[in-house]
A protein has these predicted regions:
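E1/E1-like adenylate-forming module used to activate ubiquitin-like modifiers
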Residues: 2-24, 144, 149-150, 155, ...
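Glycine-rich adenosine-cofactor-binding loop
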Residues: 64-101
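N-terminal charged helix/coil linker that caps or initiates catalytic domains
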Residues: 1-73
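Hydrophobic residues within alpha-helices
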Residues: 85-86, 129, 177
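Core catalytic loop region at the nicotinamide-binding pocket of NAD(P)H-dependent oxidoreductases
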Residues: 252-263
Length: 283
């Protein structure tokens, strides 16, 4: 790799204030034999900001943007919720993503799943994520895992993740995921959707939020199988999950801890429900 001081001098010469345009980042990659991620790392260390993140800066500082770039987030489920979550995390500049899903795209996904199209039918969802992120933000590293999450493999699948995002479509899998996150001490941002409705909650290690939320679940398919899933509900709930994820990564604001944000898009009503409203154990 080229001498970092020489690279920094090139970047400083071509910066617009403290912003560096994509064309100059590409030229630095070509001239000095850098990967996109290597170039972006040097840009941040030089006190500069890639211009793609310019509109983030009124919300977060350059130092916080660099922190996002150094963060790893695992997303379990790459369909309706997960596709939007992964796209938004990549656009926000989270530098390391793990995309976990055993399935491939089918025709019934076309109405709502961001990464599904006639050209991706039959393509593994996790692999489609890697391709899409490579197009949207090539500096982001994606590890696609074409497999189901199982708690026995939690160490391998979630290693190094600062946050895990639950974008699953079954209660059983969701409870297994929360157990794996608890074991590893990783915060979990959980979301689910059904028809016009959805919820988001954030579970920190030691909390039993999902166990209480599903205390009366008796097995079988979730309510989404009855109410269906349109295009807009996953987009709305996924955006809330990404906001929660960024807050946890950067220690900003007030997370949805020990409460559930219930979203009703039919009546345009949003309610924050404390966990005290739910049973304390499964019965």
């Amino acid at each position: 790799m080229a001498d970092t001081d020489i690279v920094r001098a090139f970047l400083a010469e071509n910066a617009e204030g403290d912003l560096l345009a994509w064309s100059h980042q590409v030229e630095a990659m070509r001239r000095f034999g850098l990967s996109c991620a290597e170039a972006e790392k040097i840009i941040f260390r030089a006190g500069l900001l890639p211009k793609r993140y310019q509109r983030n800066r009124r919300m977060i500082s350059t130092a916080q943007q660099e922190r996002l770039f150094g963060s790893r987030v695992a997303v379990v489920g790459c369909g309706g919720l997960g596709g939007y979550v992964l796209e938004e995390l990549a656009r926000m500049g989270v530098g390391h993503l793990v995309a976990i899903d055993p399935d491939s795209f089918e025709e019934h996904n076309l109405n709502r799943q961001l990464l599904s199209s006639p050209s991706t039918l039959g393509v593994g969802k996790a692999l489609a994520v890697a391709r899409r992120v490579g197009e949207v933000n090539p500096a982001v590293e994606v590890r696609p895992v074409q497999a189901s999450f199982v708690s026995d493999r939690a160490d391998a699948l979630l290693a190094g993740a600062a946050v895990v995002v639950d974008a699953l479509d079954s209660v059983e899998a969701r409870l297994e995921l929360t157990a794996g996150c608890a074991k590893l001490g990783i915060p979990l941002v959980s979301g689910t959707i059904a028809g016009w409705f959805g919820y988001v909650t954030t579970v920190f290690p030691g909390e039993k939020t999902l166990e209480r939320l599903y205390s009366r679940w008796s097995g079988g398919r979730g309510i989404e199988a009855e109410l269906g899933n349109p295009a807009f509900t996953p987009a709305a709930v996924a955006s809330l999950q990404v906001a929660e994820t960024v807050k946890v990564l950067l220690d900003l604001g007030t997370p949805l801890r020990n409460r559930v944000l219930c979203v009703n898009l039919l009546d345009m009503d949003v309610e924050s429900v404390p966990m005290d409203a739910f049973p304390t154990s499964r019965s």
